[in-house]
Amino acid sequence: KGAQVKLFYNDGEYNDWKETFGEDGPKGWNVKYFKGLGTSTSAEFKDYFANKKIVDFVYNGKSSDDTIDKIFNKKRADDRKVWLENYDKNAYLDTSHSSIQYEQFINNEMIHFSTYDCARSIPNMVDGLKISLRKILFSAFKRKLTSEIKVAQFSGYVSEHSAYHHGEASLNGAIVNMAQNYVGSNNINLLKPNGQFGTRLMGGADAASPRYIHTELNPIVDKLFPSLDFTLSIFTVSNSI
């Protein structure tokens, strides 16, 4: 906001700060998500090194060993399931401390990644969609995608309007998969495959380049997701979108 800059090291700290503004949120502030080091400018790097934030990790012997082993040992999948069952989305790591225990980092910080990884990778039982597919569908509704558009162009729209933080190459692939209608692909393809979207013989891997193929909403989507229901939907807010 103007010359003011506030840094947050996790979503929990940011959400707590955002809630201090009430229902309207932090008006006037520009919110920027830093995906990796490449997001930072040269001036920001100079500031990072001028104000180094160094946190020491504390090792607690067997307790730390067991916690680390539980997360990375392939044979302890059942223990990880119990760990994820106890997930609290409101718990987060206090980054103001100069030292943290390995257990604290894993149970209050890494667990957010592991839970989100499951949400991204496993279709939801309610609608059968993963997060990326739901963002694609949301963007299609927002754009009123009733006429065809190039897959490559649509992926750019999705990335801009749904706070998609991952590569557009994977987003292109998700859109292509969402439109495939050969036997063994989708029970119902929510997008139309206007072009060569791959074949059963190659498992869809022979789809043409996203620059050459087009898509649009399948008319059946209006029956599955009636627009009259949208006012009842609970929308997720991400990056102020």
Task: List where the protein language model places each region.
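Conserved phosphate-chemistry cores used by DNA topoisomerases
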Residues: 1-241
